[in-house]
Amino acid sequence: MLYPEQNEARLKLSLDGTWAFALGSCVEDQFDPAKPLPDAQPIAVPASYNDQNDQTTALRRHYGWAWYQRKVTLPTFCAGQRVVLRFGSVTHTAKVWLNGQLIAQHKGGFTPFEADVTALLRPGETVLLTVACDNRVNHSTLPVGNEDGQLAFFGSDNAGIPSVEAAKRAAAPQNRPNFDFFNYAGIHRPVVLYTTPKEYIEDVTVVPAVDGTVQYAVKTTGSAPVHVTVLDADGNAVASAEGTEGTITIPEVHLWEPRPGTPYLYTLHITCGADVYDQTFGVRSIEVRGTQVLLNGKPLYFKGFCKHENFTAHGRGFDPVLNVKDVNLIHWANANAVRTSHYPYAEEFYDLCDREGILVMDETPAVGIGGGAAVNPYKEYPLAEHHRQVLAEMIHRDKNHPCVVLWSLGNEPDLEHFPQDAYDYWHPLYELAHQLDPQNRPVTLVCCQNDYTKDITTRTMDIVCINRYYGWYNLSGDMDAACYGLNQELDFWAEQHKPVMMSEYGADTVAGLHTAGAEMFSEEFQVEFYRRLDAEFDKRPWFVGEFVWNFADYDTVQGPMRVDGNKKGLFTRDRRPKLGMHFLRQRWAEIPTFGFKE
């Protein structure tokens, strides 16, 4: 599925703005999609609906279906064109109708879907567009939610007390997310109506090599001839070819590298009959060799942030202003990488990372797969087929982005209590990712703090990615003990002869809280936490990167472990740097992107 663009052959109409909105229930088809929604209120699209009306808690705590509606008119000059309705994402399950006719259904809240509406939307006609989205999470969704009677992530309980058990049975149905970020829902990314000629370009794949050869494949409908031209960054034609697939050689090729290098971008300009499409790409290689990660043949060190799509008012909704702000802060911090924890981000963010030279670890929404020793998720959770779907959709969507250098299959599953079942679940996904990716990027699985000696899955990934909270959730506040424990574990990973990086580590920090002795939750402790652990990373030649948790404070489900969300951000939620950020900014300024541990 190509990203929609407007050019001489294609028209793109934004349907973003203020829509009509109504909360539903757990009844799937509660409202008639052919009629106006009853008692509708205004809602902004794209955005989460949860925080748009503080006069009521109903939106914030909603459980079930929510309904959107607006009218759509196709201009008369679109006559004779194919017409497609496209959603960047709807969380988590979506149904879409035009004039009451069901045209699309999609499960998964972080990847796009579309419907050909040529036969239903005639030029000059106005129709009623209705969208329903279901925010419920459970053992069959990604991310995973807990079922009735279970707790939300970091929830508390006094199991066995009669009054508590009775209250749980009497409680209203609600989401119990098994993940540590707020379960925002709604139409989160742009909605567009776009046109193409009747015979059109359906898909484009680009596989560049650092010697300047570029393999390409163009999927089309119909039999019109295909012509491709490579344009350099100034728009000059530097190579061309005929046919739906082949190899082009770019003379004196410029390579794509993260900043402070040059993230050089080319454009593959494609014509097919009356249709035209431009696909940007960068020429770079990425591979694992021994205990090194090589980008363009040079040993790479990741200096990165884990992030969330999370901000006040619009929740997880797409915000180009915030994306630009965050990318500039990433540059200011002297970082070079982002992990899309814990789901694929908006497509436009990857375009920005391509342009701005930021490396991306691209992650599926597979978070929360595990419930302790009492529950085997690999036998009891019906997830495998949906997991394959979201992995395939992510790779197909993001395959041409030079910024994407690593696929993450998921975050912190249970890998120790049922080790063989875990391996049997995750290893086929590892193989599938390699099969699906035409550029054959490295693949990883981000593992949580566990008994790593029992985990037989993480060690089989191309890069070992470990989330560890030595000094915070365990050995709390004792950084001497934390460093000792970390080194005990790092000795184990040294024996695996793989590149290893810290994919998540951090300390909750209340902005403005200062203590003389670097006590937990203070800004001074955040500095001490990173200073001590980072010094241990630097001693290991096979340690290839660090992704701090988190870029900014963010909202979570309420519970006794969270006060107004997760405070591990190096920036506050409104993007003010904490003391720890100033420390890391100086550290990262002294670490080169290439050759740090040659």
Residues covered by each model-derived region:
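Secreted/periplasmic carbohydrate-active enzymes, especially glycoside hydrolases
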Residues: 1-347, 352, 356-360, 390, ...
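Substrate-binding clefts and catalytic carboxylate motifs of secreted carbohydrate-active enzymes
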Residues: 7-31, 171-172, 179-186, 193, ...
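Proline-centered loop/turn at the N-terminus of a beta-strand
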Residues: 357-359, 365, 440-442, 499
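The substrate-binding groove and active-site-proximal loops of carbohydrate-active enzymes
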Residues: 109, 176, 180, 308-321, ...
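Short hydrophobic/aromatic-enriched beta-strand-loop microsegments
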Residues: 106, 357-364, 462-468
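Feature marks short, surface-exposed loop/turn motifs that line or immediately flank catalytic pockets
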Residues: 91, 135-137, 287, 308-309, ...
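Catalytic metal-binding/acid-base residues of hydrolase active sites
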Residues: 134-136, 343, 365, 410-414, ...
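Short low-complexity, flexible loop/linker segments enriched in glycine and/or proline
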Residues: 145-146, 352-356, 375-380, 384-387, ...
